[in-house]
């Protein structure tokens, strides 16, 4: 065949960010005649690269193919400024050259996190636990040291660096180090420092048993009033007192008292340990609806060994709240939905009411519909009426039930309503809301209050 100049293609290696290794790149020349060819490699500044390896030309389909490889230390790529190197080819039918891009060594700094032990996590004799330090999200993968401050030599276990699991984006790495500490050293308010060095920079995280800006700022107390829905359903008022950021739970006490007659029976529940190593506790007491609605004040008192003095918070029914009765509308399923012969969706709109606390329930054949058959929105402000609220409830039934003529009733309870309750019903025959008295269904749950 006639003489033919080569076509040149770069061959780029995968990233290898181990600074002690080398990265191989290559240059492919193809479709040339005659078969004699010479490769050379240069940096961007045209200085020669000598660590090369050539392969003999191979005849394929009447023309020749040849490759050349070059080897560069990873550390040169990590720390160098070149973005490519140059592959030059000399051939009797014409010289050519091609830029071969260097692998991109993405640099991402580590995020260093410390995880402190909860107070109940110390075991044994002497009592011990672990501080955990994790560096994550960094690239390349080398971390020059991971150590705890004051150059602690014993009790430190550092895992291997590992790639973080992710579906997309650049590969990043993480490493975890554990330091075994004794309880008396931890409680002596020593500061432990985890230091991570990456690409010549030092990142660190402090940990101690003292309160710091990234640890809980102290025990907090929140009183929660009874909701109208719970008052309506149980015919009693439940007072709740939430205590958060407890380092330990064994010494916490929560008690409810009232203005008159003193102490209330208080039931306390303790949470599981939270991710930040703290606990929370809930103290609940029950009073009569009339007592709550009278405006009487109730006080939650909290004691704990970490508190210099008791915490108290008082709650009572808000006074002077504007009260507006809701308008209630029940809408039948749309004709388009029924034509699909699958399901029927009924809507109950509750509009223009205040305060926002409301209770909505669906009733069929005189019995409450199971709660998993309908969904009720949270109260939302009326867009055109400041201070008023609306909510809606959606009930889904089978198309057969609707077409059989079943009657469905939306029951709405709100403190502004006569007898606290109103209802609207709809069925296939009317296609529009009708009144249907179901108040007795719900009032049967009334309990005695002593």
UniProtKB/Swiss-Prot annotation:
Keyword terms: Immunoglobulin domain
Annotated Gene Ontology cellular component terms: immunoglobulin complex, circulating
GO BP terms: antibacterial humoral response; complement activation, classical pathway
Protein name as annotated: Ig mu chain C region
PROSITE patterns: IG_LIKE, IG_MHC
Pfam families on file: C1-set
UniProt xrefs under CDD domains: IgC1_CH3_IgAEM_CH2_IgG (cd07696), IgC1_CH3_IgAGD_CH4_IgAEM (cd05768)
InterPro entries: Ig-like_dom, Ig-like_dom_sf, Ig-like_fold, Ig/MHC_CS, Ig_C1-set, Immune_Resp_Modulators
Organism whose genome encodes this protein: Canis lupus familiaris (Dog)
């Amino acid at each position: 065949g006639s003489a033919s100049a080569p076509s040149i293609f770069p061959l780029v290696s995968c990233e290898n960010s181990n600074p002690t290794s080398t990265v191989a790149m290559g240059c492919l020349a193809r479709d040339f005649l005659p078969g004699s060819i010479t490769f050379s490699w240069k940096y961007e500044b045209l200085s020669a690269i000598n660590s090369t390896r050539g392969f003999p030309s191979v005849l394929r389909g009447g023309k020749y193919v040849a490759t050349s490889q070059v080897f560069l230390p990873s550390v040169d790529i990590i720390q160098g400024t070149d973005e490519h190197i140059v592959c030059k080819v000399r051939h009797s039918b014409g010289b050519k050259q091609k830029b071969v891009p260097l692998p991109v060594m993405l640099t991402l700094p580590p995020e260093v996190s410390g995880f402190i032990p909860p107070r109940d996590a110390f075991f044994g004799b002497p009592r011990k636990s672990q501080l955990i330090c994790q560096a994550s999200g960094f690239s390349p993968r080398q971390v020059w040291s991971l150590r705890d401050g004051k150059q602690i030599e014993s009790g430190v276990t550092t895992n291997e660096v590992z790639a973080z699991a992710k579906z997309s984006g650049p590969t990043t790495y993480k490493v975890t180090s554990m330091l075994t500490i004794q309880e008396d050293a931890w409680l002596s308010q020593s500061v432990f420092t985890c230091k991570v060095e990456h690409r010549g920079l030092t990142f660190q995280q402090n940990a101690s048993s003292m309160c710091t800006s990234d640890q809980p700022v102290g025990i907090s107390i929140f009183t929660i009033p009874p909701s109208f829905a719970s008052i309506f359903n149980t015919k009693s008022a439940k007072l709740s007192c939430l205590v958060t950021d407890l380092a330990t739970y064994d010494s916490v006490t929560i008690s409810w008292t009232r203005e008159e007659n003193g102490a209330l029976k208080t039931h306390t529940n303790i949470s599981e340990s939270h991710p930040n190593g703290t606990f929370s506790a809930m103290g609940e007491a029950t009073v009569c609806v009339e007592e709550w609605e009278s405006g009487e004040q109730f006080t939650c008192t909290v004691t704990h060994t970490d508190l210099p003095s008791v915490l108290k918070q008082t709650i009572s029914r808000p006074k002077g709240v504007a009260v507006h009765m809701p308008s209630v509308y029940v809408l039948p399923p749309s004709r388009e939905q029924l034509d699909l012969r699958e399901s029927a969706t009924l809507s109950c709109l509750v509009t223009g009411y205040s305060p926002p606390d409301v209770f909505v329930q669906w009733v069929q054949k005189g019995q409450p519909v199971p709660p998993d058959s309908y969904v009720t929105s949270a109260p939302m402000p009326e867009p055109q009426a400041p201070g008023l609220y609306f909510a809606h409830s959606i009930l889904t039934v089978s198309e057969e039930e609707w077409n059989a003529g079943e009657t469905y009733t939306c029951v709405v309870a709100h403190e502004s309503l006569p007898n606290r309750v109103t209802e609207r019903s709809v069925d296939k025959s009317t296609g529009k809301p009708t009144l249907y008295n179901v108040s007795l269904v719900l009032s049967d749950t009334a309990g005695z209050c002593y």
